[in-house]
Amino acid sequence: MKIFSTLLSQKPKGKLVIRPSTTIHSSDPFSKFIVTKNTEPLSLGDLRKSDSGNSAVCLNAENTILSTLTDLQKEEERNWDPVKFVAGKLRGVISPIQAYVTIGKKFSPNSLVYTSRFFQLHYFPEDHFMSCFRKSKPAITVKSNKKFYLNGKVFNKDKEYFNETRISKANEVELSKIQTAMTRLTNRHRNSIPSEFAYLRRDLKLKVKTTFIKEWCKLNGDKAIREYVNLNRSPNINPASMKGKPKKSFLDNLGRSTVGTAKDGYYLYIVSIFPDKDMLGEFNDEVNRSVQKVANLDWDGFLTPKKGTKGKNWVESFNDSINVQTINKILEINKFPFELRREQTEG
């Protein structure tokens, strides 16, 4: 029994880190492709209109022919939305890594942190394999699945909706009737699933990202990252000890965001029901609650695996399952000037 217990209690193989590629050489810094430990977070706190990215305005200032702003450009300036601007800067992870995980269905059940009738949210902390390749702080991907025709809003002969709740709870006979009704409808009208329309997918992403970044910044996620970055840049301060922190700190003694503070990392939303004008308010509330749920996670409790090898948290177990050689081959094929390494931890 003692030997068996020892076998189960194993230490992680090492921390996953990104290092310069030994095969692909480039003068471009990592920050052009992925975030680094010193990458600043996205924030709503210090935005100015000059940050709006209206390149036409900047070009006109230097162009004698187009020295005055057109009425259209003035209108764009007046209608500039700083929240949508920052939301537009939210990125996910580099596509080869996203494909590697999605196609291989390499999701840990521990990453699923929030479920609603609209979507599921998977959250991956910053030291998770996927977060190593995120393109913004925080990172977010909004995906949709082809679950319901017309968002489940299909009338039966009694003018009752075959909505998503009814579908999920239907017995075999009723489900057969629902499927028949939907098949007849979709045979007449192609592309009856919202996720098949590119403009609806774009609109969905903007809705999620706009609501997400407002709540994430409201919960001080940007301040926590900035605090850690500043401490990490200071040669005389060890981020692991965090002694002498400011009175209002958003980090604990291990340099992690405190409970109630929005977290850095990678957020993956998988949406089943697209919000229309009748349900947009409820949808936004659910997005807010999902961000709050992650912010309120206790790190030790969240990282403890539901089952698995003793001595490792679920992120370490997932990282240990990654074939580094395979990942580096994928990165090389896609011409990324960096590769994945395992950095041995002390102790």
UniProtKB/Swiss-Prot annotation:
Disruption phenotype: Mutants are deficient in mitochondrial protein synthesis. Keywords: Mitochondrion. It comes from the Eukaryota. One of its GO terms (biological process) is mitochondrial tRNA 5'-end processing. Signal peptide: none annotated. It is found in: Mitochondrion matrix. Its main location: mitochondrion. One of its GO terms (cellular component) is mitochondrion. The keyword Protein biosynthesis does not apply. Present with 721 molecules/cell in log phase SD medium. This is Protein PET130. It comes from Saccharomyces cerevisiae (strain ATCC 204508 / S288c). The lineage of its organism: Eukaryota, Fungi, Dikarya, Ascomycota, Saccharomycotina.
